[in-house]
Protein backbone atom coordinates (compact mmCIF):
# COMPACT_ATOMS: atom_id res chain seq x y z
CA UNK A 1 0.00 0.00 0.00
CA UNK A 2 1.10 3.58 -0.60
CA UNK A 3 0.58 6.79 1.26
CA UNK A 4 -1.76 8.60 -1.08
CA UNK A 5 -1.13 11.90 0.70
CA UNK A 6 2.50 11.80 -0.40
CA UNK A 7 2.18 10.24 -3.84
CA UNK A 8 -1.31 11.38 -4.76
CA UNK A 9 -3.14 8.13 -5.36
CA UNK A 10 -6.86 8.83 -4.94
CA UNK A 11 -8.56 5.84 -6.50
CA UNK A 12 -12.15 4.74 -6.73
CA UNK A 13 -13.65 1.88 -8.70
CA UNK A 14 -17.11 2.87 -9.87
CA UNK A 15 -16.99 0.39 -12.77
CA UNK A 16 -17.61 -2.43 -10.30
CA UNK A 17 -21.20 -1.23 -9.81
CA UNK A 18 -21.96 -2.81 -13.19
CA UNK A 19 -23.10 -6.43 -13.42
CA UNK A 20 -20.24 -8.91 -12.96
CA UNK A 21 -20.49 -10.01 -16.59
CA UNK A 22 -18.82 -6.75 -17.67
CA UNK A 23 -15.48 -7.49 -16.02
CA UNK A 24 -13.27 -9.99 -14.27
CA UNK A 25 -11.38 -8.96 -11.15
CA UNK A 26 -7.80 -10.17 -11.46
CA UNK A 27 -4.46 -8.86 -10.17
CA UNK A 28 -1.59 -7.90 -12.47
CA UNK A 29 1.15 -10.48 -12.99
CA UNK A 30 4.35 -9.27 -11.24
CA UNK A 31 7.47 -8.63 -13.32
CA UNK A 32 11.10 -9.36 -12.57
CA UNK A 33 12.92 -6.03 -12.41
CA UNK A 34 10.84 -2.98 -13.33
CA UNK A 35 12.60 0.21 -14.37
CA UNK A 36 10.96 3.57 -15.06
CA UNK A 37 11.72 4.57 -18.65
CA UNK A 38 9.45 7.60 -19.05
CA UNK A 39 7.19 9.58 -16.74
CA UNK A 40 4.81 12.27 -17.95
CA UNK A 41 5.42 14.93 -15.29
CA UNK A 42 2.81 17.44 -16.43
CA UNK A 43 0.09 14.79 -16.71
CA UNK A 44 1.06 13.38 -13.33
CA UNK A 45 0.62 16.79 -11.71
CA UNK A 46 -2.76 17.37 -13.38
CA UNK A 47 -3.93 14.00 -12.04
CA UNK A 48 -2.89 14.95 -8.52
CA UNK A 49 0.34 12.94 -8.31
CA UNK A 50 3.70 14.06 -7.01
CA UNK A 51 6.06 13.20 -9.90
CA UNK A 52 9.08 12.87 -7.64
CA UNK A 53 7.25 10.32 -5.50
CA UNK A 54 6.21 8.37 -8.61
CA UNK A 55 9.89 7.95 -9.49
CA UNK A 56 10.58 6.03 -6.29
CA UNK A 57 10.92 2.25 -6.33
CA UNK A 58 7.72 1.66 -4.36
CA UNK A 59 5.70 3.62 -6.92
CA UNK A 60 7.46 2.11 -9.92
CA UNK A 61 6.36 -1.24 -8.49
CA UNK A 62 2.76 -0.03 -8.77
CA UNK A 63 3.24 1.14 -12.37
CA UNK A 64 4.68 -2.30 -13.11
CA UNK A 65 1.79 -4.14 -11.48
CA UNK A 66 3.97 -5.63 -8.72
CA UNK A 67 2.01 -3.94 -5.95
CA UNK A 68 -1.49 -2.53 -5.72
CA UNK A 69 -2.17 1.03 -4.52
CA UNK A 70 -4.76 1.84 -1.90
CA UNK A 71 -8.26 2.00 -3.35
CA UNK A 72 -7.43 -0.09 -6.42
CA UNK A 73 -9.60 -2.93 -7.69
CA UNK A 74 -7.75 -4.35 -10.70
CA UNK A 75 -10.07 -5.72 -13.34
CA UNK A 76 -10.13 -6.70 -16.99
CA UNK A 77 -13.07 -5.29 -18.93
CA UNK A 78 -15.20 -7.44 -21.21
CA UNK A 79 -16.32 -6.10 -24.57
CA UNK A 80 -16.97 -7.22 -28.13
CA UNK A 81 -16.11 -5.73 -31.47
CA UNK A 82 -16.38 -5.83 -35.22
CA UNK A 83 -12.77 -6.35 -36.31
CA UNK A 84 -12.48 -5.53 -40.00
CA UNK A 85 -16.20 -6.21 -40.24
CA UNK A 86 -16.24 -9.52 -38.35
CA UNK A 87 -17.92 -9.71 -34.94
CA UNK A 88 -15.98 -11.20 -32.03
CA UNK A 89 -16.35 -11.30 -28.26
CA UNK A 90 -13.15 -9.77 -26.92
CA UNK A 91 -12.04 -8.10 -23.69
CA UNK A 92 -8.85 -6.76 -22.12
CA UNK A 93 -6.38 -9.46 -23.06
CA UNK A 94 -3.30 -7.71 -21.71
CA UNK A 95 -4.52 -4.69 -19.80
CA UNK A 96 -6.04 -4.08 -16.39
CA UNK A 97 -8.04 -1.14 -15.12
CA UNK A 98 -6.63 -0.60 -11.64
CA UNK A 99 -9.06 2.15 -10.73
CA UNK A 100 -10.26 5.67 -11.41
CA UNK A 101 -8.09 8.53 -10.22
CA UNK A 102 -10.04 11.45 -8.79
CA UNK A 103 -8.09 14.61 -9.60
CA UNK A 104 -7.76 17.71 -7.39
CA UNK A 105 -10.42 19.36 -9.57
CA UNK A 106 -12.80 16.43 -9.07
CA UNK A 107 -12.43 14.85 -12.52
CA UNK A 108 -12.37 11.08 -12.90
CA UNK A 109 -9.85 9.25 -15.10
CA UNK A 110 -9.26 5.55 -15.68
CA UNK A 111 -5.77 4.33 -14.80
CA UNK A 112 -4.99 1.27 -16.88
CA UNK A 113 -1.85 -0.88 -16.96
CA UNK A 114 -1.24 -2.13 -20.50
CA UNK A 115 0.97 -5.20 -20.78
CA UNK A 116 0.24 -6.27 -17.20
CA UNK A 117 -0.17 -10.00 -17.85
CA UNK A 118 -2.75 -12.53 -19.02
CA UNK A 119 -6.46 -12.27 -18.29
CA UNK A 120 -9.43 -14.55 -19.00
CA UNK A 121 -9.78 -12.61 -22.29
CA UNK A 122 -6.21 -13.18 -23.52
CA UNK A 123 -7.16 -15.76 -26.16
CA UNK A 124 -3.89 -17.69 -25.85
CA UNK A 125 -1.82 -14.50 -25.68
CA UNK A 126 0.81 -13.88 -23.01
CA UNK A 127 -0.76 -10.62 -21.81
CA UNK A 128 2.49 -8.74 -22.26
CA UNK A 129 3.63 -5.81 -24.40
CA UNK A 130 6.91 -4.84 -26.02
CA UNK A 131 8.87 -1.71 -25.17
CA UNK A 132 8.84 -0.29 -28.71
CA UNK A 133 5.05 -0.23 -29.17
CA UNK A 134 4.50 1.16 -25.66
CA UNK A 135 6.92 4.01 -26.32
CA UNK A 136 5.21 4.53 -29.67
CA UNK A 137 1.83 4.92 -27.99
CA UNK A 138 3.38 7.37 -25.53
CA UNK A 139 4.82 9.51 -28.35
CA UNK A 140 1.73 9.51 -30.57
CA UNK A 141 -0.85 9.99 -27.82
CA UNK A 142 1.04 12.94 -26.37
CA UNK A 143 1.47 14.43 -29.86
CA UNK A 144 -2.28 14.12 -30.38
CA UNK A 145 -2.91 15.86 -27.07
CA UNK A 146 -0.61 18.70 -28.13
CA UNK A 147 -2.51 18.96 -31.42
CA UNK A 148 -5.71 19.46 -29.36
CA UNK A 149 -7.26 16.17 -30.46
CA UNK A 150 -9.23 14.24 -27.80
CA UNK A 151 -7.15 11.23 -26.82
CA UNK A 152 -6.21 8.76 -24.17
CA UNK A 153 -2.90 9.76 -22.63
CA UNK A 154 0.25 8.10 -21.36
CA UNK A 155 1.40 8.57 -17.78
CA UNK A 156 4.40 6.25 -17.74
CA UNK A 157 6.33 3.51 -19.48
CA UNK A 158 8.08 0.92 -17.31
CA UNK A 159 10.38 -1.78 -18.66
CA UNK A 160 9.78 -5.17 -17.05
CA UNK A 161 13.25 -6.69 -17.21
CA UNK A 162 11.67 -9.67 -18.96
CA UNK A 163 11.74 -10.57 -22.65
CA UNK A 164 8.63 -11.27 -24.66
CA UNK A 165 8.50 -13.37 -27.77
CA UNK A 166 6.84 -12.27 -31.00
CA UNK A 167 8.64 -12.78 -34.32
CA UNK A 168 11.81 -12.21 -32.30
CA UNK A 169 12.76 -11.71 -28.66
CA UNK A 170 11.85 -8.19 -27.51
CA UNK A 171 12.17 -6.25 -24.24
CA UNK A 172 8.90 -6.17 -22.30
CA UNK A 173 7.20 -3.03 -20.98
CA UNK A 174 4.03 -1.75 -19.33
CA UNK A 175 2.29 1.48 -20.31
CA UNK A 176 0.14 3.37 -17.82
CA UNK A 177 -2.73 4.64 -19.94
CA UNK A 178 -5.08 7.40 -18.77
CA UNK A 179 -8.56 7.80 -20.24
CA UNK A 180 -11.86 9.48 -19.45
CA UNK A 181 -13.04 5.87 -19.54
CA UNK A 182 -12.47 2.72 -21.56
CA UNK A 183 -16.14 2.25 -22.45
CA UNK A 184 -16.35 1.47 -26.14
CA UNK A 185 -18.95 0.87 -28.82
CA UNK A 186 -17.85 -2.73 -28.37
CA UNK A 187 -18.85 -2.63 -24.70
CA UNK A 188 -22.44 -1.94 -25.76
CA UNK A 189 -22.22 -4.63 -28.43
CA UNK A 190 -21.12 -7.06 -25.74
CA UNK A 191 -24.08 -6.14 -23.55
CA UNK A 192 -26.54 -6.41 -26.43
CA UNK A 193 -25.13 -9.76 -27.58
CA UNK A 194 -25.74 -11.23 -24.13
CA UNK A 195 -29.43 -10.46 -24.52
CA UNK A 196 -30.02 -8.90 -21.10
CA UNK A 197 -31.92 -5.63 -21.35
CA UNK A 198 -31.25 -5.05 -17.64
CA UNK A 199 -27.48 -5.27 -18.24
CA UNK A 200 -27.72 -3.01 -21.29
CA UNK A 201 -29.67 -0.43 -19.28
CA UNK A 202 -27.17 -0.66 -16.44
CA UNK A 203 -24.30 0.07 -18.84
CA UNK A 204 -26.18 2.93 -20.50
CA UNK A 205 -27.15 4.45 -17.14
CA UNK A 206 -23.56 4.21 -15.89
CA UNK A 207 -22.23 5.78 -19.10
CA UNK A 208 -24.71 8.64 -18.93
CA UNK A 209 -23.89 9.34 -15.31
CA UNK A 210 -20.16 9.27 -16.01
CA UNK A 211 -19.92 11.04 -19.36
CA UNK A 212 -23.20 12.77 -20.19
CA UNK A 213 -24.98 13.66 -16.94
CA UNK A 214 -26.70 16.54 -18.71
CA UNK A 215 -28.94 14.09 -20.61
CA UNK A 216 -30.26 12.27 -17.52
CA UNK A 217 -33.26 14.58 -17.28
CA UNK A 218 -34.15 14.54 -20.99
CA UNK A 219 -37.32 12.89 -22.31
CA UNK A 220 -35.38 9.86 -23.58
CA UNK A 221 -31.87 9.70 -22.07
CA UNK A 222 -30.85 6.70 -24.20
CA UNK A 223 -31.62 8.51 -27.45
CA UNK A 224 -29.80 11.55 -26.08
CA UNK A 225 -26.81 9.34 -25.23
CA UNK A 226 -26.65 8.13 -28.83
CA UNK A 227 -26.91 11.71 -30.07
CA UNK A 228 -24.06 12.87 -27.85
CA UNK A 229 -21.74 10.03 -28.87
CA UNK A 230 -22.44 10.75 -32.55
CA UNK A 231 -21.72 14.42 -31.97
CA UNK A 232 -18.38 13.73 -30.28
CA UNK A 233 -17.27 11.21 -32.87
CA UNK A 234 -18.19 13.57 -35.72
CA UNK A 235 -15.96 16.19 -34.11
CA UNK A 236 -13.14 13.72 -33.43
CA UNK A 237 -12.97 12.24 -36.94
CA UNK A 238 -12.97 15.72 -38.47
CA UNK A 239 -9.98 16.60 -36.30
CA UNK A 240 -8.18 13.45 -37.46
CA UNK A 241 -8.78 14.32 -41.10
CA UNK A 242 -7.64 17.91 -40.66
CA UNK A 243 -4.17 16.87 -39.45
CA UNK A 244 -3.82 13.84 -41.71
CA UNK A 245 -4.04 11.25 -38.94
CA UNK A 246 -4.81 7.69 -40.05
CA UNK A 247 -5.91 5.42 -37.21
CA UNK A 248 -5.53 2.18 -39.08
CA UNK A 249 -7.78 -0.08 -37.01
CA UNK A 250 -11.19 1.56 -36.55
CA UNK A 251 -12.83 -1.57 -35.20
CA UNK A 252 -15.81 -0.99 -32.93
CA UNK A 253 -13.75 -1.94 -29.87
CA UNK A 254 -11.52 1.05 -30.68
CA UNK A 255 -14.33 3.62 -30.81
CA UNK A 256 -14.77 5.21 -27.39
CA UNK A 257 -18.05 6.47 -26.00
CA UNK A 258 -16.21 9.47 -24.55
CA UNK A 259 -15.02 10.60 -27.99
CA UNK A 260 -11.32 10.07 -27.27
CA UNK A 261 -8.85 8.50 -29.70
CA UNK A 262 -7.72 5.11 -28.40
CA UNK A 263 -5.31 2.39 -29.57
CA UNK A 264 -2.26 3.66 -31.40
CA UNK A 265 -1.15 0.33 -32.88
CA UNK A 266 -1.02 0.72 -36.67
CA UNK A 267 -1.69 4.47 -36.80
CA UNK A 268 0.44 6.94 -38.75
CA UNK A 269 0.35 10.47 -40.14
CA UNK A 270 -0.02 11.15 -43.84
CA UNK A 271 2.93 12.68 -45.68
CA UNK A 272 1.89 13.34 -49.29
CA UNK A 273 -1.83 14.00 -49.62
CA UNK A 274 -3.77 11.01 -50.92
CA UNK A 275 -7.29 9.97 -49.98
CA UNK A 276 -6.33 6.31 -50.36
CA UNK A 277 -3.41 6.38 -47.92
CA UNK A 278 -3.11 3.20 -45.84
CA UNK A 279 -0.25 2.32 -43.49
CA UNK A 280 -1.51 -0.71 -41.57
CA UNK A 281 0.01 -4.00 -42.70
CA UNK A 282 -3.22 -5.84 -41.90
CA UNK A 283 -5.54 -3.43 -43.75
CA UNK A 284 -4.93 -5.10 -47.09
CA UNK A 285 -8.25 -3.93 -48.58
CA UNK A 286 -7.91 -0.29 -47.48
CA UNK A 287 -11.01 -0.50 -45.28
CA UNK A 288 -9.58 2.12 -42.93
CA UNK A 289 -7.80 4.32 -45.51
CA UNK A 290 -7.59 8.05 -44.81
CA UNK A 291 -10.54 8.91 -47.06
CA UNK A 292 -12.68 6.10 -45.63
CA UNK A 293 -12.40 7.11 -41.98
CA UNK A 294 -15.59 9.20 -41.85
CA UNK A 295 -17.59 6.39 -43.49
CA UNK A 296 -16.15 3.78 -41.15
CA UNK A 297 -16.96 5.93 -38.12
CA UNK A 298 -20.57 6.11 -39.32
CA UNK A 299 -20.57 2.32 -39.77
CA UNK A 300 -19.21 1.82 -36.25
CA UNK A 301 -21.78 4.20 -34.77
CA UNK A 302 -24.52 2.29 -36.57
CA UNK A 303 -23.39 -0.76 -34.59
CA UNK A 304 -23.80 1.28 -31.39
CA UNK A 305 -27.28 2.31 -32.47
CA UNK A 306 -28.16 -1.33 -33.19
CA UNK A 307 -26.99 -2.31 -29.73
CA UNK A 308 -29.18 0.36 -28.13
CA UNK A 309 -32.36 -0.55 -30.04
CA UNK A 310 -33.87 -2.59 -27.16
CA UNK A 311 -33.85 0.49 -24.92
CA UNK A 312 -34.43 3.33 -27.42
CA UNK A 313 -38.18 2.68 -27.55
CA UNK A 314 -40.53 -0.04 -26.36
CA UNK A 315 -41.77 -0.51 -29.93
CA UNK A 316 -39.01 -2.20 -31.96
CA UNK A 317 -39.99 -0.60 -35.28
CA UNK A 318 -40.00 2.84 -33.71
CA UNK A 319 -36.66 2.12 -32.04
CA UNK A 320 -35.18 1.11 -35.39
CA UNK A 321 -36.47 4.30 -37.00
CA UNK A 322 -34.96 6.40 -34.19
CA UNK A 323 -31.61 4.65 -34.59
CA UNK A 324 -31.59 5.16 -38.36
CA UNK A 325 -32.59 8.81 -38.05
CA UNK A 326 -29.84 9.55 -35.56
CA UNK A 327 -27.11 7.75 -37.52
CA UNK A 328 -28.10 9.64 -40.67
CA UNK A 329 -27.12 12.87 -38.89
CA UNK A 330 -23.48 11.84 -38.50
CA UNK A 331 -22.40 12.68 -42.04
CA UNK A 332 -23.83 16.21 -41.86
CA UNK A 333 -22.24 16.84 -38.47
CA UNK A 334 -18.90 15.49 -39.67
CA UNK A 335 -18.99 17.56 -42.88
CA UNK A 336 -19.83 20.72 -40.93
CA UNK A 337 -16.95 20.12 -38.52
CA UNK A 338 -14.49 19.32 -41.29
CA UNK A 339 -15.59 22.24 -43.47
CA UNK A 340 -15.26 24.69 -40.59
CA UNK A 341 -11.81 23.28 -39.81
CA UNK A 342 -10.47 23.34 -43.38
CA UNK A 343 -11.68 26.92 -43.77
CA UNK A 344 -9.68 27.88 -40.69
CA UNK A 345 -6.64 26.20 -42.26
CA UNK A 346 -7.11 28.61 -45.19
CA UNK A 347 -7.82 31.69 -43.08
CA UNK A 348 -11.49 31.93 -44.01
CA UNK A 349 -13.80 33.47 -41.42
CA UNK A 350 -16.98 33.85 -43.44
CA UNK A 351 -18.98 31.70 -45.85
CA UNK A 352 -19.14 32.19 -49.59
CA UNK A 353 -20.95 30.17 -52.22
CA UNK A 354 -17.81 28.88 -53.93
CA UNK A 355 -15.75 28.01 -50.84
CA UNK A 356 -16.30 24.28 -51.32
CA UNK A 357 -15.02 24.50 -54.88
CA UNK A 358 -11.99 26.53 -53.76
CA UNK A 359 -11.08 23.90 -51.18
CA UNK A 360 -11.59 21.01 -53.58
CA UNK A 361 -9.35 22.61 -56.22
CA UNK A 362 -6.48 22.87 -53.74
CA UNK A 363 -6.85 19.30 -52.50
CA UNK A 364 -7.10 17.96 -56.05
CA UNK A 365 -3.87 19.74 -57.01
CA UNK A 366 -2.16 18.53 -53.83
CA UNK A 367 -3.08 14.95 -54.65
CA UNK A 368 -1.98 15.28 -58.29
CA UNK A 369 1.44 16.66 -57.36
CA UNK A 370 1.89 14.46 -54.26
CA UNK A 371 2.24 17.53 -52.06
CA UNK A 372 3.07 17.05 -48.40
CA UNK A 373 -0.17 17.62 -46.49
CA UNK A 374 1.22 19.31 -43.38
CA UNK A 375 3.94 21.33 -45.08
CA UNK A 376 1.64 22.64 -47.82
CA UNK A 377 -0.75 24.23 -45.35
CA UNK A 378 2.12 25.56 -43.28
CA UNK A 379 3.78 27.05 -46.37
CA UNK A 380 0.53 28.87 -47.14
CA UNK A 381 0.41 30.03 -43.52
CA UNK A 382 3.96 31.39 -43.59
CA UNK A 383 3.58 32.59 -47.19
CA UNK A 384 6.81 30.83 -48.12
CA UNK A 385 6.03 29.04 -51.36
CA UNK A 386 9.26 27.33 -52.26
CA UNK A 387 10.23 24.87 -54.95
CA UNK A 388 7.75 22.06 -54.36
CA UNK A 389 6.24 20.83 -57.66
CA UNK A 390 2.78 21.90 -56.48
CA UNK A 391 3.75 25.55 -56.14
CA UNK A 392 5.15 25.67 -59.68
CA UNK A 393 2.05 24.11 -61.23
CA UNK A 394 -0.49 26.09 -63.28
CA UNK A 395 -3.29 24.62 -61.15
CA UNK A 396 -1.79 26.05 -57.98
CA UNK A 397 -1.05 29.46 -59.49
CA UNK A 398 -4.65 29.75 -60.62
CA UNK A 399 -5.90 28.57 -57.23
CA UNK A 400 -3.61 30.96 -55.36
CA UNK A 401 -5.06 33.98 -57.16
CA UNK A 402 -8.59 32.82 -56.35
CA UNK A 403 -7.65 32.30 -52.70
CA UNK A 404 -6.01 35.72 -52.37
CA UNK A 405 -9.08 37.35 -53.87
CA UNK A 406 -11.24 35.41 -51.43
CA UNK A 407 -9.15 36.65 -48.48
CA UNK A 408 -9.46 40.23 -49.70
CA UNK A 409 -13.26 40.01 -49.74
CA UNK A 410 -13.38 39.27 -46.00
CA UNK A 411 -13.93 42.07 -43.54
CA UNK A 412 -11.10 40.60 -41.45
CA UNK A 413 -7.57 41.62 -42.43
CA UNK A 414 -5.08 39.30 -44.08
CA UNK A 415 -3.03 39.50 -40.89
CA UNK A 416 -6.02 38.11 -38.99
CA UNK A 417 -6.42 35.40 -41.62
CA UNK A 418 -2.81 34.33 -41.28
CA UNK A 419 -3.12 34.28 -37.49
CA UNK A 420 -6.12 31.98 -37.82
CA UNK A 421 -4.13 29.73 -40.14
CA UNK A 422 -1.18 29.67 -37.76
CA UNK A 423 -3.42 28.37 -34.98
CA UNK A 424 -4.83 25.61 -37.18
CA UNK A 425 -1.88 24.44 -39.28
CA UNK A 426 0.75 22.60 -37.25
CA UNK A 427 4.41 23.12 -38.03
CA UNK A 428 5.17 19.61 -36.87
CA UNK A 429 3.49 16.23 -36.67
CA UNK A 430 5.01 12.95 -35.46
CA UNK A 431 6.51 12.01 -38.82
CA UNK A 432 6.58 8.25 -39.20
CA UNK A 433 10.28 8.04 -40.02
CA UNK A 434 11.19 10.25 -37.06
CA UNK A 435 9.13 8.15 -34.67
CA UNK A 436 10.81 4.98 -35.95
CA UNK A 437 14.21 6.61 -35.57
CA UNK A 438 13.46 7.43 -31.92
CA UNK A 439 12.15 3.93 -31.20
CA UNK A 440 15.12 2.23 -32.80
CA UNK A 441 17.56 4.27 -30.71
CA UNK A 442 15.58 3.50 -27.55
CA UNK A 443 14.98 -0.21 -28.05
CA UNK A 444 18.18 -1.26 -29.81
CA UNK A 445 20.70 1.08 -28.22
CA UNK A 446 19.05 2.08 -24.93
CA UNK A 447 19.39 5.71 -26.05
CA UNK A 448 16.30 7.67 -25.03
CA UNK A 449 17.70 11.08 -25.94
CA UNK A 450 16.36 10.85 -29.51
CA UNK A 451 12.86 10.24 -28.17
CA UNK A 452 13.17 13.07 -25.64
CA UNK A 453 14.16 15.55 -28.35
CA UNK A 454 11.26 14.41 -30.50
CA UNK A 455 8.79 14.77 -27.62
CA UNK A 456 10.07 18.28 -26.91
CA UNK A 457 9.64 19.26 -30.55
CA UNK A 458 6.10 17.83 -30.64
CA UNK A 459 4.97 19.59 -27.46
CA UNK A 460 4.11 22.91 -29.19
CA UNK A 461 3.08 21.94 -32.71
CA UNK A 462 1.62 25.29 -33.73
CA UNK A 463 4.60 27.40 -32.66
CA UNK A 464 7.67 27.31 -34.88
CA UNK A 465 11.05 26.88 -33.21
CA UNK A 466 14.48 26.11 -34.60
CA UNK A 467 14.43 22.79 -32.72
CA UNK A 468 11.48 21.69 -34.86
CA UNK A 469 13.14 22.32 -38.22
CA UNK A 470 14.75 18.90 -38.55
CA UNK A 471 11.46 17.17 -37.77
CA UNK A 472 9.44 18.91 -40.49
CA UNK A 473 11.11 17.26 -43.48
CA UNK A 474 9.10 14.51 -45.18
CA UNK A 475 10.77 11.14 -45.62
CA UNK A 476 12.88 10.52 -48.69
CA UNK A 477 10.74 8.67 -51.27
CA UNK A 478 11.55 4.98 -51.37
CA UNK A 479 10.39 1.89 -53.16
CA UNK A 480 9.26 0.44 -49.84
CA UNK A 481 6.11 2.12 -48.51
CA UNK A 482 5.93 2.74 -44.76
CA UNK A 483 4.01 0.01 -42.94
CA UNK A 484 2.66 -0.13 -39.40
CA UNK A 485 1.83 -3.11 -37.22
CA UNK A 486 -0.54 -3.79 -34.31
CA UNK A 487 2.17 -3.87 -31.67
CA UNK A 488 0.24 -1.81 -29.14
UniProtKB/Swiss-Prot annotation:
Which EC class heads this enzyme's classification? transferase
> Which residues are annotated as active site?
253
UniProt keywords, alphabetically: ATP-binding, Magnesium, Manganese, Metal-binding, Nucleotide-binding, Nucleotidyltransferase, Transferase
Protein's UniProt keywords contain Lipoprotein: no
Q: What is its EC number?
A: 2.7.7.-, 2.7.7.108
Coiled-coil ranges per UniProt:
none
Per its record, how is this protein called by name?
A: Protein nucleotidyltransferase YdiU
Q: Which organism is it from?
A: Bacillus mycoides (strain KBAB4) (Bacillus weihenstephanensis)
Amino acid sequence: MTNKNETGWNLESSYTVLPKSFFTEIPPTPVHSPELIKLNNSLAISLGFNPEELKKDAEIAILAGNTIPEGAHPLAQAYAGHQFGHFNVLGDGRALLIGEQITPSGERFDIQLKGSGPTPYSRRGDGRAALGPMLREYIISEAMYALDIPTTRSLAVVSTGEPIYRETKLPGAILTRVASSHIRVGTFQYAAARGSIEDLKALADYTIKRHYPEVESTENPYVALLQEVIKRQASLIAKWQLVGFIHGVMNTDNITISGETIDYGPCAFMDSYNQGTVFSSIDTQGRYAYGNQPYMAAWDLARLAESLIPILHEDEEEALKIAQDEISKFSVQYENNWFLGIKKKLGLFSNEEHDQSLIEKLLKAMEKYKADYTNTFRALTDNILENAPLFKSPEFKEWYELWQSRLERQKESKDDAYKLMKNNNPVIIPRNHRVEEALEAAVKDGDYSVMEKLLQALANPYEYSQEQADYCTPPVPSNRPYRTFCGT
